């Protein structure tokens, strides 16, 4: 499956060390003014080559090939391409016949009998550049309806941040090399990350995304629940191993009286005094902030020696992965999780009839 969505459908294509990665967006409404500078800023947030990220230096300049005329969307498929300019496959030559632990090398081979050994091919996080490009278009659409999607690193290397105000946290995190909004936590996480790097190892963490001003009523009962759709979207991101919404697994440790969000009247509107539900009840948005967290595993490409198998010789082997890899993928995962949340919300608003096919 390379296509995602219902009314708003996104197909991504391309491999890590191929000529390019890209996406085609179908079902996008006509008449939206396309802010290409905004799209490029979103790409910059995910782009490699920064502190604590892989030193693969990709420009990640998006080219819009179709679906936009004189600065406006035309309701025809929007095709976007990002050219790969700094792929170096030489470090993978020695890995042609061995599987890297923690990667999809073995499972792709087991399923298809063939795999692109250059940087993970289609399974590489390089594919997420296309998701961020598509997500930027979704954010531009949501912005028209005052819906904001903001993310930050909630936890890295076991060090968690305290967050009271999502908008302030987002602003602070954007100035942080680790995208952490808490300076104290950032310093401690940075120290743990450096320790792991010195040992040829890597660390994981948690991304938190908050969507504000989401209207009540998004999502469908039973099998079309908004929280299920969000989890499906985010779990499809490479390195994501878990998703929770609102109180999440902490709800299992609460009593009903603690977990239930009291319903109140505020300025003549029905609201909720707390938000343990994370903005979703019965699979349908309730008008409060959507709060989602994604667990990101440690980067599996590490120089520390690991056991594996050489499948040509059919014998056990030892592997030390060389090349340019992120010691922690969490900071660059933030805009990717945001992108998938934005695509889901835009799709649901189209399904609900809150966004027309033409904005003109």
Swiss-Prot record:
Residues annotated for FMN binding in this entry: 122-124, 282, 297-301, 324
Gene Ontology terms describing biological process: amino acid biosynthetic process; aromatic amino acid family biosynthetic process; chorismate biosynthetic process
Keyword Amino-acid biosynthesis set for record: yes
Keywords: Amino-acid biosynthesis, Aromatic amino acid biosynthesis, FAD, Flavoprotein, FMN, Lyase, NADP
Stored SUPFAM superfamilies: Chorismate synthase, AroC (SSF103263)
One MF term in the entry's GO annotations: FMN binding
Cofactor: FMNH2
PROSITE patterns recorded: CHORISMATE_SYNTHASE_1 (PS00787), CHORISMATE_SYNTHASE_2 (PS00788), CHORISMATE_SYNTHASE_3 (PS00789)
EC number: 4.2.3.5
Binding site for NADP(+): 46
Domain of life: Archaea
One Pfam family linked to the record: Chorismate_synt
Family membership: Belongs to the chorismate synthase family.
NCBIfam families in the cross-refs: aroC (TIGR00033), PRK05382.1 (NF003793)
UniProt function note: This reaction introduces a second double bond into the aromatic ring system.
UniProt-recorded name of the protein: Chorismate synthase
